[in-house]
UniProtKB/Swiss-Prot annotation:
Ranges for region Hypervariable stalk region: 36-88
UniProt keywords, alphabetically: Calcium, Disulfide bond, Glycoprotein, Glycosidase, Host cell membrane, Host membrane, Hydrolase, Membrane, Metal-binding, Signal-anchor, Transmembrane, Transmembrane helix, Virion
Membrane topology note: Single-pass type II membrane protein
Topology Intravirion: residue spans: 1-9
Full protein name: Neuraminidase
Glycosylation sites: 61, 70, 86, 146, 200, 234, 402
Cysteine-cysteine disulfides: 92-417, 124-129, 183-230, 232-237, 278-291, 280-289, 318-337, 421-447
Gene name of the encoded protein: NA
Annotated signal sequence range: none
EC number per UniProt: 3.2.1.18
Residues that, per the record, bind Ca(2+): 293, 297, 324
Note: The influenza A genome consist of 8 RNA segments. Genetic variation of hemagglutinin and/or neuraminidase genes results in the emergence of new influenza strains. The mechanism of variation can be the result of point mutations or the result of genetic reassortment between segments of two different strains. Strain A/Udorn/307/72 is a laboratory-adapted strain.
Subcellular location per the Swiss-Prot or TrEMBL entry: Virion membrane; Host apical cell membrane
Species lineage: Viruses, Riboviria, Orthornavirae, Negarnaviricota, Polyploviricotina
Amino acid sequence: MNPNQKIITIGSVSLTIATICFLMQIAILVTTVTLHFKQYECDSPANNQVMPCEPIIIERNITEIVYLTNTTIEKEICPKLVEYRNWSKPQCKITGFAPFSKDNSIRLSAGGDIWVTREPYVSCDPGKCYQFALGQGTTLDNKHSNDTIHDRTPHRTLLMNELGVPFHLGTRQVCIAWSSSSCHDGKAWLHVCVTGYDKNATASFIYDGRLVDSIGSWSQNILRTQESECVCINGTCTVVMTDGSASGRADTKILFIEEGKIVHISPLSGSAQHVEECSCYPRYPGVRCICRDNWKGSNRPVVDINVKDYSIDSSYVCSGLVGDTPRNNDRSSNSYCRNPNNEKGNHGVKGWAFDDGNDVWMGRTISEDSRSGYETFKVIGGWSTPNSKLQINRQVIVDSDNRSGYSGIFSVEGKSCINRCFYVELIRGREQETRVWWTSNSIVVFCGTSGTYGTGSWPDGADINLMPI
């Protein structure tokens, strides 16, 4: 090969190698960019909700001939699909209840601006628990707090704070309401807020901060709802509402709601005679509620809700140790599962219970006649055996010398099971404490535990003589 041919050959080879290197660098660049965008491709969820996902740092060291490429993907916030809650995990096995939270609202009102409230409850989103109550449009140390014993005024609003944070002046007023229920479907909060005239009230359905639907009174006699959390399964939320006599036949309906819109209404069916102020919990694939019979029974009604076909059944808790107040003493009280016991049925108080196999856990006032003291216990066979009375694992939450009030259930989903928790309303002021003109409350909260626990009493604790009049 002559010198000219050698030069041409070397030049051609060099040009070919250079071309290959150039094309490879283009391929590397395209691959890197493609991987970058594929790494962060995420489906956009409905209603534009995003949750931060863990950032992933990808380092690529690619060596090609004499070129070194170091590519680092920056940290990014990636939209992650938020799913509806389905509550399909089993119920936690518990030995009793352990202290969880206490807000001390009345004690703090002696020296601070705290709302006057009643009808409190607790509900949780997937990450945090909140306390709710119906405010009276005034703080306690304020002349507007006079005569706040009345349940229904146009100034009452639903208040919402993180659990354990008393309702201070900066508290959010979610809606106008003198009766309410709230629950989180996994994507957003639903609030059911009842207000208006006794004979023509309105229930507003607020979802994700927006008014979505409403319904008017259907019996023109104090439309009212649960005063505790509703329950959502796979995007369908259920709420029990009653309109009609508080001491006679009333018209109870179960509303099915999807993202704030009423999609179905079922009438109450089964053997329950009177149903108010239900304490509901998820019992997959349905919802179960323990309610107040304010007409015939001191045994509590049970309402079973089928979320799939909208069917309803109702009965009564079988335990002969009954849960309402007033009631007969435990020796003479009865319950036979299907019907009201006709024992001191007129009047009552909101309460709760939940099934545990054939047994039942329940809470009630210690007093048989007044809203004083509070206790919890398990009744063996109390869910399935008529008039069962074998009580175990009794705990005192509030001693009998101190006032209690409404109580209700809420559910918390853990890693492997669903825990049941309850709150107790600790009422202070009128009617019993006539030194002051106001009526308000604080709360104490307990949750189920599989561990051991001690004893105590957790009353409101405010000295009424130190309180504003």
